[in-house]
């Protein structure tokens, strides 16, 4: 059984026990988060596609940790004008494990 969920503006294919890195969720470590935006559910070979979400379906995610991603460097430069701007960014994320898919 698997499902496609949407969180943080991105879509993820999830199965029970799978570990995901999603955009930062407003939850503490150890909390269980319920995701109601389930776009697709596959169970015993039968695929149910939502319009846009599957009614009554939800995924339960357990928060494992919070962290920051790899640093990316944004560098702006204008040639011959001595204009240089360097800025770094680390996107916050939440590591979750899928506990259950209810459909």
Curated annotation (Swiss-Prot):
Record SUPFAM superfamilies: L21p-like (SSF141091)
GO terms under biological process: translation
A Pfam entry, by short name: Ribosomal_L21p
Domain of life (superkingdom): Bacteria
InterPro entries: bL21-like (IPR028909), bL21-like_sf (IPR036164), Ribosomal_bL21 (IPR001787), Ribosomal_bL21_CS (IPR018258)
Disulfide pairings: none
Keywords: Ribonucleoprotein, Ribosomal protein, RNA-binding, rRNA-binding
Cellular component, GO annotation: cytoplasm; ribonucleoprotein complex; ribosome
GO molecular function, one term: rRNA binding
Family: Belongs to the bacterial ribosomal protein bL21 family.
Function: This protein binds to 23S rRNA in the presence of protein L20.
Subunit structure as annotated in this protein's UniProt entry: Part of the 50S ribosomal subunit. Contacts protein L20.
NCBIfam families: L21 (TIGR00061)
Protein name listed in UniProt: Large ribosomal subunit protein bL21
Gene it is expressed from: rplU
